[in-house]
Every structure is written in structure tokens, then in C-alpha cells.
Design a protein with these regions (language model features):
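Phosphate-binding site recognition
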Residues: 1-78
């Protein structure tokens, strides 16, 4: 999982835009051990309230369809 509070370095994953391919590439550049397998990988974005821009990328993940995404956080106001 990616926790935006405990690991603020991940707040740069949208630096190349909201395309899934760019986000996956940027996550992999930050943490080489993270592997993404289409149809098998679940990406967990935790503490979403600390990086609300990632919510905009969720539609890209839905359209792309290769990865399931789970988001969690506190004080989201949902």
C-alpha cells in the first residue's frame, strides 16, 4: 500500500500526469521493489485526504482496467 502521510515521497507520482502508465512508472521509480501485474495487482492508496489529487486519477484507473484500486483515509468528508 501507499500511505501518503507516512510516505510523502509518493506525492510526486502525478508529476507526469494522470495516465495510469505514468503513475505506475513513477511509483516504480520511487520504490523499485513494487511490481505491477495487470489483472493481479491491487493498489491501495491510504490517507487519501493528505493527497486529494490522487482522487482525480481514479477515473483513469477505472477506464484502464488493468489494476484494482482501493482508497482509504480519515476525515474524507464522504
Amino acid at each position: 500500500s501507499i500511505n501518503f502521510v507516512l510516505e510523502p515521497k509518493y506525492k510526486t507520482i502525478l508529476s507526469d500526469g494522470y495516465a495510469v502508465e505514468d503513475i505506475i512508472k513513477n511509483i516504480s521509480m520511487i520504490e523499485y521493489s513494487k511490481r505491477f501485474i495487470a489483472g493481479d495487482t491491487v493498489i491501495i492508496f491510504d490517507e487519501l485526504q493528505s493527497f486529494p489529487d490522487i482522487a482525480t486519477a481514479l477515473k483513469s484507473f477505472r477506464i484502464d482496467g488493468r489494476f484494482d484500486v482501493i482508497c482509504s483515509g480519515s476525515l474524507l468528508g464522504i
